Structure formats: C-alpha cells, structure tokens
Amino acid sequence: MAGRRAQWRLASAQAAVRGETTVSLFGKTGEVSAWLTPEQLTDPKKTLAEFEKTVKFSSRANLPPVEPVPPKDTEYKPEGEVCFIIANGESRRNFDLNKLKGKGYTFGMNVLPVVENFWPDALMSVDIATVKWLSEKDVPAKLEHWSYPRGGVKDPRIKRIAKDWGWSSGPTATRVALEYKKFKTLYILGMDFFGITPEGIVDEKKGSKLNNMYKGKERYRKANSDRTYFGNWLNQMVTNTTNHPNANFYHVVLDNQSSPNKLAQKTNWIDINYSKFEEHLQEMAKRAS
C-alpha cells in the first residue's frame, strides 16, 4: 500500500484535474499547491497518470496473498428499513431508478436529480463547487442535501456532517446512512470502483477509461478521460463495513462484474446481480402490501 505522502500527492493531482485548489484526505484538508510543484500543476492530467503508475507499482510490490472470498447469503433478509445508495458508476445505466420509489430510503449524490430528474430522499455532495452549483439550482429546497462543514459552503439549507472525514461522496453517503440514519440494510448501486472498457465492461485490469454516468457533462471530466484511482474509495468502504459488522451491504453489479477482493472478503459485503436485485425488490413490494 502506498505511504501517506504518496496518497496525499495522488489525491492532490486528482483534485487539480477537477479544477480544485484544496484537497481532503484522512480527515484533513490542505492546499493542492502544498503537495504539487508548479511544474506538476501545469499539466495535472500527466502528473496524475505518473502518480497512478507509481502507486500501482508500489501496491503490487507489497501485495499479500489473495484470500478466498467467503460464501455469501444473497437471499432477501432485511433488518429494519432499507436504504438505497445511488452512486454514479455506469453499471446502473440500464436500471430504472423509479423502481426504488416506495421501497426504501434513497440516497443519491452530486448532480443526480438535475441530470436524471430522479429526486432521492437525500443527496450527498462533498465538493464545494458542486454544492454551490446545486444551491444555485435550488436543489436543497427540494430534498435533504448533505455536505461537510467546510467554510466555502454558505447555503444554510445544507445539512452539515459534524466532522469533516475527508471522504468521497459515495462512502460518505454510506457512512451517513449508517451513523446518522441508523440503517442496517443497504443496497449500493453504481459503486463500480474500476474503470470501464471501450465495450462498456467494468473491469479492474482492462477498464482504462473513466467510469461515470455523467462524464462529458457540466462539472465532470471529458468522456474519453482515463479512469480515476479508486484506492481511497475502497479503503473508505472497507472502513464502513468493518465499523458496522451488523449491517449488510448488498452491492448490485452486472453479471460480468465483481467487487475488489478487499471488500469481497468482508462477510457483510454481498455482491448480487440485477436479476437477484429485482427479486429483492419484489419481496419488498410484498412486505409493503
């Protein structure tokens, strides 16, 4: 695993590519310029690509033996109310989010309601510029909009998390669902981790391109951009599963898709395909009737 300094530099390069001047990691926030030289900032995409290669090489050099994935129970066995975490990976592209209505609490992120016209119960945005953009479109007036307690966020309608964890939107939304909302049964859609191939396959090794529903749209990178380093998201979700062993995380994936092994080893992280997910939704409808 890459050292903390390397992870800060990598996160800073990612922030620079997004046009941000600050970076958050390990519960702290700092200036991007503190971690990158002026030369590196002139071409942040090139800098990011170099850092990703370094981190990948370091990770492989220290790779422990792969542990087998334990058997999982994929049947519908909810505890309490259900929460749907809607991330923005392309694996959910052909799923109609309206099927979730009336089945449980929906927690989306970033531009979901504006671009897809699907309004979840709650929305998570951790990037200050995105929060401002959504506020200008009056999104916080129509749903519960969460973010970190950062000074750049002035809209009083935004619900502030008590402490800035420095996490990405998906893992942060999951943690709020667990620790603020107290859900113990979570379904996670579109949290793909890996990049995507030109054929649209989510793959850890061959998926070299950006995997995001909104690539090419306002506030997002170009459609042909390289994939984003997922190590930080992965570690954050591992923390969620570890800190909440009594919660079940149903990770909804395509038939040819799987979770990173580090998560798959967790007994409460359960991959299910969309056919099995549809079965679960039908069971929810039966319980509600």
For the regions a language model picked out, list residue spans one by one.
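Metal-ion/cofactor- or nucleotide/acyl-coenzyme-handling active-site neighborhoods
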Residues: R4-R5, G30-W35, K56-S289
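Basic, mixed-charge low-complexity alpha-helical segments
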Residues: R4-R9, A49, K53
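A short beta-strand micro-motif
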Residues: A6-L10, V23-K28
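A short, charged, amphipathic alpha-helix used as a generic interaction element across diverse proteins
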Residues: Q40-V55
